[in-house]
């Protein structure tokens, strides 16, 4: 319950940070590519990337999810889908993509970790472009 509450609060905080950025398409970062592809540079790119991993993480534990609506709404629906399975608290370990083991606990931790790394990048970029006084800091960076 605590990890779920943290994962949902993390989504709310991410949305609050994103909503506070005055221009969602501004950036201070140069284009950069990794083996995963282009690195998100704008608040909008970071938000869409972070929101869209909901389907990936939930799929790793065989839960149907989507990324419609905002990050909080789609994460909440993912948890509702998860909790419709009577055995969801068994913390079953499943083989996911690339042979990696996944459990509910791991998915919860990963949501929090992933939100935080992209929130920090978004916050740093936004204060560089707009100044700290114009950007919310719900993660207390």
List each model region and its residues.
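Short, contiguous alpha-helical
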Residues: 24-72, 97-141
């Amino acid at each position: 319950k605590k990890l779920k509450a943290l994962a949902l609060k993390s989504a709310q905080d991410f949305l609050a940070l994103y909503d506070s950025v005055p221009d969602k398409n501004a950036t201070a970062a140069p284009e950069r590519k990794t083996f995963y592809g282009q690195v998100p540079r704008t608040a909008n790119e970071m938000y869409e990337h972070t929101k869209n991993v909901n389907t990936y993480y939930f799929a790793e534990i065989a839960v149907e999810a989507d990324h419609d609506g905002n990050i909080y709404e789609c994460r909440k629906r993912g948890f509702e889908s998860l909790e419709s399975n009577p055995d969801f608290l068994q913390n079953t370990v499943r083989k996911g993509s690339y042979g990696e083991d996944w459990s509910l606990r791991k998915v919860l931790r990963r949501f929090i970790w992933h939100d935080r790394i992209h929130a920090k990048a978004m916050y740093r970029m936004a204060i560089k472009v707009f100044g700290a006084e114009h950007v919310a800091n719900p993660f207390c960076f």
